[in-house]
Amino acid sequence: MNGPVPTNLAPTTGGGSWLSVIALALAAFIFNTTEFVPVALLSDIGRSFDMSTAQVGLMLTIYAWVVALASLPMMLLTRNIERRRLLLFVFLVFVVSHLLSWLSQSFAMLLLSRIGIALAHAVFWSITASLAVRVAPPGQQAKALGLLATGTTLAMVLGIPLGRVVGEALGWRVTFLSIAGVALATMLCLMKSLPLLPSQNSGSLRSLPILFKRPALVITYVLVTLVITAQFTAYSYIEPFALQVAQISGERITLLLLLFGGAGVFGSVLFSRYSDRFPHGLLVGSIGLLAACLLLLLPLAGNFYLFAGLSMFWGVAILSFSLSLQSKTLKLASDATDVAMALFSGIYNIGIGGGALLGSIVSSQLGVASVGWAGGSVAVVGLLLAMASTRRFREALSH
């Protein structure tokens, strides 16, 4: 998940285009959906290849770590390429890779296709938020960023549950084929609506030493690593946890995913309303709520209604956290936004991959019932760091 960038980029000449902004928001929806939709399909994919969910879950780790390793190098390699051409090429790779996922007859082939998608993802999130600002109608940059954030949020609300519904009805391969179809339509829309977009404010390797000399920014990146690792230790295995531990039916698991994602919308509203008044309090509160939800995952698994309520608080917590950290990153690195966001995306995906790997190890060694305890313990470490860093953040953001 990635978010807005500052609006200090030059807009395009002309009047801007809401069609382009909407297409970019749809693209954000598609890219976030495909990253996490395997979470809802682990059991089905495992049955296809006669593998355990812990083994299939490593696909999430590989995807995330490819994004993490590729984000900054790909951003630097492509920093001088005209953005419309680059974005269309990214979509071409994305669509072809999803067609390979649809055709996969082995887990190795599926992994190869996911690596192609991950490379497209790495470039996409390094450039897209700044493009939304540039193509927005004059004076409408904030609304454009809001639409992009909405697309990101809707991936959790609708994309992942819809992917599960399609997978349950028609098979997991059709889920990937459907994503390819929607991506192709979005690509054609962008091809028609986007103007030429020369690269701007992309930054360079010279930005890195400067950024890493900012203690508050370094703490932000460490918090991202810890808390996202905690989140995906449990979330990566929520489907097998719900099936095997909570004894919840497939239809109710889809409902849980909808509740989790829908509650994230409320987290976005909380962030919009209170982030300026209580920037650090919102961050600490969201980490504390996340830690509590993860630690209560197993104790509340026996009651569907309590478990559903927990899922909603969990959704609020993780989206509030993600938006808070993105906002801090962009304020602390407004002079090198593309580099800072490429680092953020890479580190976020280190957390996703690390969490999926830790969840796989815990599931294999202790059982899937223990993923909440493991994730919650890591979240508590993040909470302590956030509480200890209050003064550092206030000093850095007051300048």
Curated annotation (Swiss-Prot):
SUPFAM superfamilies: MFS general substrate transporter. PROSITE patterns: MFS. It comes from the Bacteria. Keywords: Cell inner membrane, Cell membrane, Membrane, Sugar transport, Transmembrane, Transmembrane helix, Transport. It is found in: Cell inner membrane. The chain crosses the membrane at residues 21-41, 56-76, 87-107, 115-135, 142-162, 176-196, 215-235, 252-272, 281-301, 304-324, 339-359, 366-386. CDD domains: MFS_NepI_like. It is a multi-pass membrane protein. GO terms for molecular function: carbohydrate transmembrane transporter activity. One of its GO terms (cellular component) is plasma membrane. Involved in the efflux of sugars. The physiological role may be the reduction of the intracellular concentration of toxic sugars or sugar metabolites. Belongs to the major facilitator superfamily. SotB (TC 2.A.1.2) family. HAMAP family: MFS_SotB (MF_00517). PANTHER family: PURINE EFFLUX PUMP PBUE (PTHR43124), SUGAR EFFLUX TRANSPORTER (PTHR43124:SF4). This is Probable sugar efflux transporter. It comes from Pseudomonas putida (strain W619). The lineage of its organism: Bacteria, Pseudomonadati, Pseudomonadota, Gammaproteobacteria, Pseudomonadales. The gene is sotB.
